[in-house]
């Protein structure tokens, strides 16, 4: 698998991807995160997008459909598409730290998701810290 640099005009292509996500029937909200969201892409950057979907029976099929269309729109296969419905708490926390909202059909539902995700993450991080301390001190 070889890495391909993002198109030089990636910033000009993003609005069309945003429109696609805003109009996709399953997408409730979406974030751009990572180096592009920070406005600091590097030569090794990819496009990091996180989506939350509703009314989906097959998450994998929906992800592949959306990913395929985003590849066409953004003219690259260097896209990391994350389904927030099924991903882990540390990755959700990473998305929440550095993101740009690019689709938001149901702001109240998004707010509830963000609040619950952050509370769960902080509860998890406290438990994780305790477990690591025990492991470190007890070998």
Summary of predicted features, one role per range:
Residues 1-29, 37-39, 43, 54-139:
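Catalytic core of pol beta-like nucleotidyltransferases
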Residues 47-51:
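Short, aliphatic-rich beta-strand segments
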């Amino acid at each position: 698998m070889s890495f391909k640099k993002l198109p030089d005009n990636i910033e000009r292509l993003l609005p069309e991807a945003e429109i696609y996500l805003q109009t996709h029937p399953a997408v409730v909200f979406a974030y751009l995160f990572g180096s592009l969201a920070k406005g600091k892409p590097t030569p090794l950057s990819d496009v990091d997008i996180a989506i939350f979907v509703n009314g989906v029976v097959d998450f994998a099929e929906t992800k592949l459909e959306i990913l395929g269309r985003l590849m066409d729109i953004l003219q690259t296969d260097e896209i990391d598409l994350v389904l927030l419905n099924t991903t882990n708490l540390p990755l959700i926390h990473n998305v929440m730290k550095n993101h740009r909202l690019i689709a938001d059909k149901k702001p109240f539902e998004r707010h509830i998701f963000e609040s619950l995700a952050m509370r769960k993450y902080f509860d998890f991080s406290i438990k994780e810290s305790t477990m690591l301390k025990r492991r470190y001190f007890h070998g």
